[in-house]
Amino acid sequence: MIRPKSKTLGDLLDEMSVTRGSQTALVFGDVNISFSEWRKEVDKFARSLLSVGIKHGDRVAVLASNRPEWLIAAFAIAKIGAVMTAVSTFSTSRELNWCLNQSGAAALIMLSKIRGQDFLAEIRADCPELSEQQPFAFDSPALPELKTVITIDGETEGAIASWSDFMNRNSLYSEEALLDAQASVNPEDICYILYTSGSTASPKGVMLAHKGVIENGFDIGERQHLTEKDRLWLAVPLFWSFGSANALPAIMTHGGTIVLQESFDADRALTII
């Protein structure tokens, strides 16, 4: 397999959409998304991020299970040079607050509830202003850097915007503005902050660069002899390195298909496989 020319995640997705545009990139249940469709959604999300003032170097947190929206958000964040802060879906309320504050997240893309845990209610408990303010202008002393909260599952109230409403903002920024932002991204720039489990102390943020994720991922795929004909079942969490910094770039750099399982369930896994 030929090593991709791209050295940043945004460029990598563009490269794959050109060379393998109609090929299926993502499978989630009955939904199939091609590389071209993935890129289109990423570009819309990236322009929407620019519309709310997210810029190169800003931290944007993602709190979600293994879903296409996680991957759309992550690559959109990377495409404009911002840093995707992956939050564990096993986080306690204290750990969630710690990760958002410690990373200085300017925006949060989230599922309101995951496996029965109401994360949005936990944020409201710390930040009652969330229910009283306007979207994209959130201001709370508990999370002083956070200005934008977007829910994937559509819950809206006060400063909370839905995924669809946020995506509709993409028309406020041109394709040229996105290209300018993308051109500013350096291969050595940080693309991910992935947090450790926090078993011995508070979770620690580990910074990973675009080039390192791509190069390491390609080499992993080479050792596994992956090709564009392969499908990779991905049930390990994307918020940890095995998911987003190992399995994901390994299959993506080889043009294969990612089959997402939202969270591990043995019976469901056998059906998917």
Map each language-model feature to its residues:
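Conserved AMP-binding/adenylation subdomain of ANL enzymes
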Residues: 214-234, 239-272
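Conserved AMP-binding/adenylate-forming core of the ANL superfamily
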Residues: 3-10, 14, 22-75, 92-97, ...
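Conserved G/P- and acidic residue-centered "switch" motifs that form tight phosphate/ATP-binding loops
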Residues: 81, 199, 255
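Structural motif
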Residues: 63, 87-90, 111, 235, ...
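Short hydrophobic alpha-helices that are characteristic scaffold elements of the AMP-binding
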Residues: 75-80, 101-102, 240, 252-253
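Structural core segment of the AMP-binding/adenylate-forming
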Residues: 52, 80-165
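Conserved S/T- and glycine-rich ATP-binding loop of Class I adenylate-forming
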Residues: 60, 77, 190, 196-199, ...
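Conserved pre-ATP/AMP-binding loop-to-beta segment of ANL
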Residues: 6, 22, 142-146, 150-157, ...
